Amino acid sequence: MNVRERVDLARRHLAKSLELKGEHIGVIEMRRHFSCYFKGLPNFKETRLKLVTLYDIPQIYGLLDEIEERWGDYAPEAVSVYQQQ
């Protein structure tokens, strides 16, 4: 899945979170998920820190647009949530 697809999924996830939880809780709960959506992107630390500290919803959507523009076609290696033992 490339970054463009991940951004689209993150936008839909954010919209649902806002709808179900309200603006304040919805934004706060999405912060933990954003890191997972964009894990493995090169030089992403500064953008990630910004993404997980923003409260303003239009700014969050704007930053998602920037992520899509900058890394859009990049496809990081799939990361399993299950560790093999």
Outline where the language-model segments fall.
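Alpha/beta catalytic cores of nucleotide-metabolism and tRNA/nucleoside-modifying enzymes
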Residues: 1-85
